[in-house]
A protein has these predicted regions:
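A conserved beta-strand-loop-helix scaffold within acyl/acetyltransferase catalytic domains
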Residues: 1-84, 100
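Short alpha-helix boundary/capping motifs
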Residues: 33-34, 91, 118
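Amphipathic coiled-coil/heptad-repeat helices and related helical stalk/stem segments
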Residues: 36-37, 94, 121
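Surface-exposed alpha-helical segments enriched in charged/polar residues
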Residues: 41, 95-99, 126-129
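Short, contiguous acidic/charged loop-to-helix segments that flank catalytic cores in large enzymes
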Residues: 80-88, 115-118
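Conserved acetyl-CoA-binding loop-helix of GNAT-fold acetyltransferases
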Residues: 85-99
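Active-site/acyl-donor-binding loops of N-acyltransferases
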Residues: 104-167
């Protein structure tokens, strides 16, 4: 049976597991990027980041990195092995995360970043639809800032200099 572990602090070994899981994910989805353990480690140092690991028979088969800001949570990265695509493992992990967030009084979960119409993303879009949440279309890139002042400055720069609104 499946077992979920939630972590707010990661070891480098945890990050190596995630790197390996994401490598399988990138291979199956033909992603143009790969997550590296040292990058994951740096990202997960932020106080608002939580990681959920899914195990089957004591073997890691999936992981999910999320960010929590007040009452909104954001999906950052999914690291799914080939095995996690079987028998609803990914759905099990997401249901666990949704229940966990609900118990923490987090009202929203934003899957982010993968828009409708992106080549090869139809399966992801269908998975998002199956959660029965509200569908929102983004009109720009997803950007993460540790410093909220920098986020606002970036927004103003895009609005005034680039003449585009990134929200």
């Amino acid at each position: 049976s499946y077992k979920v572990e939630s972590k707010k602090e990661l070891s480098l070994d945890d990050c190596l597991i995630m790197e390996s899981l994401h490598k399988e994910n990138a291979e199956s989805k033909k992603l143009s990027y790969a997550l590296k353990a040292n990058q994951i480690y740096k990202l997960c140092k932020a106080s608002n980041i939580e990681v959920f690991f899914l195990k089957l028979e004591n073997k890691f088969i999936a992981a999910r990195i999320i960010s929590i800001e007040e009452n909104i949570s954001y999906d950052i990265f999914a690291c799914n092995s080939f095995k996690s695509r079987l028998d609803g493992a990914t759905q099990f992990l997401m249901q666990y995360i949704f229940d966990y967030l609900k118990n923490q009084n987090i009202q929203y979960f934003d899957f982010s970043r993968i828009p409708l119409g992106r080549k090869g993303a139809y399966g992801v879009y269908e998975f998002k639809k199956s959660t029965r949440g509200k569908l929102l279309q983004y009109n720009s890139e997803w950007v993460f800032f540790k410093n909220k002042k920098l986020r606002h400055l970036y927004y103003l720069y895009n609005l005034i200099i680039n003449k585009k609104d990134f929200y």
